[in-house]
Amino acid sequence: MQRSLAVAAATLLAATTASAGTAKGTLVHKGKTVTLAHAYLVVGPDAIDPAKKIRRLILTADDLSAKLAACKVMSCTDGEVMEGLVVEIDGGPRLNYWMVLDDQKIQHSDTEEPSSLVATTDDAKKLAGMLTIDDTGSGGPTVAVEFDAPLVQELTAAR
């Protein structure tokens, strides 16, 4: 009986843990190229204005499904990214982004025109499309990535 309950619990956990979506593209920064392979959409409160809900697109080289599923607060979701790009959608008139490389030792953040993200799907459960950034003029990255990001986490606390 206990074994049956354990198997049922494991099956339920696997079914409720959202998996990564796909990303196909690159992030290039000062000669280093990262192949982006995984895409996630996270929804939760803004750190500055917790009454405001934002969407966060996370694009990474590594699969962070389990780590993101374990997050209980919004600030955890970007802290898990060691190599990739985090883009805040709905945070203001521009897209806010944060790039990290080499286990977060290299970082760059800036904003982009909303037109740099061309969505083919944009609903409560998924964001898909193309993101193109060329921020080399301010020391930032060049990003060209097609993505299909399912909603993997909807959080209620910013921190």
Model-derived features with residue positions:
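Bacterial N-terminal signal peptides that target proteins for export
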Residues: 1-8
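Hydrophobic h-region of N-terminal signal peptides that target proteins for export
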Residues: 10-19
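Short, hydrophobic/aromatic-rich segments at coil-to-beta transitions
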Residues: 21-22, 52-56, 124-130
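Edge beta-strand at a domain terminus
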Residues: 21-22, 27-30, 130-159
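N-terminal targeting signals for Sec/Tat export/insertion, comprising classic cleavable signal peptides
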Residues: 30-53
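Amphipathic hydrophobic-ligand
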Residues: 32-36, 109-113, 141-146
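Surface-exposed helix/loop patches within compact recognition domains
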Residues: 47-122
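Extended, loop-rich substrate-binding clefts of extracytoplasmic carbohydrate-active enzymes
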Residues: 111-136, 140-142
